[in-house]
Amino acid sequence: MYIVGIDIAKKSHQAAIMKPDGTLVGRSFRFTNTKQGFEFLMDKLAAVDSSLENFEFGMEATGHYWLNLYTWLADNHATVHVINPLQSDALRNLYIRKTKTDSVDAKIIAQVIRIGQYSETKLADDRMLMMRDLCRQRFFLVDMVANLKRKIIVMMDRIFPEYQGFFSDTFGKSSTAILKHCTTPEEITLFGEDNLAQLLQVASNGKFGLKKAQELISLARNSFAARLSSKTLSLLVKQMMEQMELLQNQIGILEKHISSHFKSFGT
């Protein structure tokens, strides 16, 4: 049984092939963290032994860069040991006192696997990894929406300061429908009572109508808005409203997937 120690990095990995007695098979070699790099690794191993079953792989859980290589090896039914980096520190220090080359870590990892003095890092299964990635993406998108809302509020304070507070929720359905069409006092006034009333009635499911439209136009006519760059800011607000709508739709899709995957855990 051969042992392949792999020193994980972001763009490329270093590998060393070791025999059971601790001697190395040839020199250590580098391969890229790509499909082509994986194929290069397989070719290198095939030159030593044609069966992947005769190799055991060892790697440290370094960030997330090991995941791609790990999953490709696992899909090929290889035996892979993922160890905590702290477990190889003592042996690493002994080697570093003697020499320091790019291949040292790969040899150390192979040696740790050969000696067997390690405990494997508990790996998440496909469902857990999927759930983690889905939740991370959701948090990322939610943060983007929050940032857009803050920017919109700042811009609206300049072009229509009285608008905030007119609706109980500036980003509720009724207010969103308005801001997608008109944002400045001038635009709202020109849009007209009838158009505003119709827009509000549809967006609010009949809760608002002509009365609310008239109140908004009155607010617009008496606004103490900054007139500098109002057209530019209006354009930016409308674009950000569109971006926010897209992000919220994407969040909804993610939440459906998260709910579906959560049910698969049987909880």
Language model segments and positions:
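A detector of single, family-specific signature residues
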Residues: 1-267
